[in-house]
Design a protein with these regions (language model features):
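N-terminal phosphate/diphosphate-binding loop that engages ATP/GTP or pyrophosphate donors
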Residues: 27-90
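Walker A/P-loop phosphate-binding motif and the immediately C-terminal alpha-helix
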Residues: 5-42
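Short, glycine/acidic-enriched loop or turn micro-motifs at the edges of active sites
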Residues: 42-44, 95, 134, 193
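Conserved catalytic-core segment of NTP-binding enzymes
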Residues: 30, 116-127, 132-205
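Residue-level signature of catalytic and energy-coupling elements of molecular machines
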Residues: 9, 13, 91, 110, ...
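Flexible beta-alpha connector loops of hexameric P-loop NTPases
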Residues: 95-105, 161-162
Length: 205
């Protein structure tokens, strides 16, 4: 499987990365590729556009309900994935209840389970798209980079300073894990105001 079709889309919350990620997954599927779409955000809304606009049960919810957070038991891929439009397999990490636990750890647990189930093995999918919250690039949110599940990193930015601040931190994490073969493929500018001059983003790039 070509790692060129395995993309991690990072960005500040509300920047539009889920829309861009789901469009990427749809584009790959329309090309006849077998696609896995992985939402790595506690809001678990990455797959909304792929499953008729309904929030799917998250990995963390299913995992805790069926097997508990430490025991994979007889967990099957079908237990944690939902078939979306165009045959895209969808999974959402979800997160803990507010004030309890770490959302980044939830992402790591999900990826560990997918790996144990063989979902992330080479040859399983033609394309894998990870939609990852980038406000805080802790070890959990950086798991797709750290564990080498994808090489190509795309950062969604806007003209807002906090979006560029988050992008700068994400770029630093890409550099940290560059020994795994990950690289920054580029920025996607999703402007809040289409009339705004793009000079700030161009200078940042």
């Amino acid at each position: 499987m070509s790692m060129q079709n395995n993309i991690v889309v990072f960005g500040k919350g509300g920047i539009g990365k889920s829309t861009i990620s789901s469009n990427l997954s749809s584009l790959y599927a329309l090309q006849g590729l077998k696609v896995l779409h992985v939402g790595c955000d506690p809001k678990h809304d990455s797959t909304l556009g792929l499953v008729d606009g309904e929030l799917i049960e998250t990995f963390m919810e299913k995992y805790a309900r069926i097997f508990g957070v430490r025991d994979h038991g007889e967990l099957k891929p079908s237990d944690i994935m939902v078939k979306g439009r165009l045959g895209i397999d969808c999974v959402e990490a979800g997160g803990p209840e507010p004030g309890v636990g770490c959302a980044g750890r939830g992402i790591s647990l999900m990826l560990e389970a997918l790996q144990d189930l063989g979902v992330l093995k080479e040859g399983g999918y033609d394309a894998r798209v990870f939609d990852v919250l980038g406000d805080v690039v802790c070890g959990g949110f950086a798991a797709p980079l750290r564990k080498g599940f994808a090489e190509k990193i795309v950062i969604v930015v806007s003209e807002e300073l906090m979006a560029l601040y988050a992008a700068n931190n994400i770029a630093k994490s890409v550099k940290t894990y560059s020994s795994n073969g990950v690289y920054l493929a580029g920025l996607v500018a999703n402007l809040k105001d289409g009339k705004v001059e793009r000079g700030r983003i161009e200078r940042f790039a």
